[in-house]
Regions:
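Acidic, Mg2+-coordinating catalytic module of metal-dependent nucleases/exonucleases
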Residues: 180, 185-256
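Repeat-based scaffolding regions
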Residues: 280, 284-287
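Acidic active-site catalytic centers that drive phospho-/nucleotidyl reactions
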Residues: 76-78, 142, 167, 232
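N-terminal accessory regions of nucleic-acid-interacting proteins
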Residues: 1-69
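Conserved DEDDh/DEDDy metal-dependent 3′-5′ exonuclease domain
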Residues: 103-192
Length: 287
């Protein structure tokens, strides 16, 4: 057992070493490069590795509907508020398109409310031709908001509505809902993927960030929200990939009884109702 003097000496040695080396440096973040678009808005581009997407589980994730994985597009928005209505706009629409060379990320930033129609046109052009639109909890707010803004801008939402849509939240609740654990995107990233976010700016700060940008005219005021949006895009894509792995091969990929039973429930929902009903009747009838 160390004496008191030895403990003090060791503590002084550790303190001296820390003073020499300094505290761990914060991770260096690359600057966000805002490009001006022909429409007068801003575009931020980035690339990331693409996860493997297994088509075998897609039918279960889509409730039996048909779609392809040839041109997957992940969509996420940042808005000026959560109330909806005609006063709320999506000032940042992020798209992550999966291709053979990885994930191409395009984040469309509205330079001013007066240029919203042009930005929405750029988004529609980028989404057109996709075989699957992937989102997280967007069905109930973001997509209706985009449709409303398109109507107000006198533009058609047909290109957006024509793409089959997978909202990962519904699948995530089946596979990963647990008592006492929420199904927010950041929570699932940490709990399911083992990837807790570091130094992330919460989406709730989006309205204030856009207001600050409009006052200053400096798009760098939105850099933190652009990074947050990019994390949302990549997190949604990673969760979709994980879900498709589990649904494609439940017995090989499921890591818990909850995942296995959730996969069974999702696959069961793809069966025609008449077949499920007749099977239940046969099971209940006396032999």
């Amino acid at each position: 057992m160390l004496s008191r003097l030895e403990v003090v000496t060791e503590l002084r040695r550790v303190i001296a070493r820390l003073e020499r080396t300094g505290s761990p440096a914060a991770p260096v973040r690359p600057p966000v490069d805002f490009e001006r678009t022909p429409s007068g808005n801003y575009l931020v581009r980035a690339r990331a590795p693409a996860p493997t997407l297994r088509p075998g589980g897609l039918a279960a994730a889509l409730g039996g509907r048909v779609a392809g994985l040839e041109r997957v597009c992940v969509l996420d928005t940042e808005t000026t508020g959560l109330a909806g209505g005609t006063g709320t706009i999506a000032f940042l629409v992020g798209l992550a398109r999966v291709g053979p060379d990885g994930v191409a990320i395009e984040q469309h930033v509205c330079a001013s409310p007066a240029r919203e129609a042009e930005m929405l046109g750029d988004v529609l052009a980028a989404v057109a031709g996709s075989t699957l639109l992937v989102t997280f909890n967007v069905r109930s707010f973001d997509l209706p908001l985009l449709r409303t803004r398109l109507v107000l801008a006198r533009r058609s939402a047909a290109a957006l509505d024509a793409v089959p849509h997978l909202d990962v939240l519904g699948t995530a609740r089946r596979l990963w809902a647990r008592p006492g654990a929420d199904c927010r995107l950041v929570s699932l990233e940490a709990r399911v993927l083992g990837r807790p976010r570091q130094d992330d700016t919460p989406g709730s700060e989006a309205p204030a960030a856009y207001a600050a940008y409009l006052r200053s005219g400096d798009p760098r005021q939105l850099a933190a929200m652009v990074r947050h949006n990019r994390e949302d895009l990549l997190g949604t894509l990673a969760l979709a990939a994980r879900a498709l792995h589990v649904l494609d091969s439940p017995f090989a990929e499921a890591e818990s009884i909850g995942e296995l039973s959730g996969a069974a429930a999702l696959w069961s929902a793809t069966r025609p109702r008449s077949r499920r009903g007749s099977s239940a009747s046969r099971a209940a009838s006396p032999r």
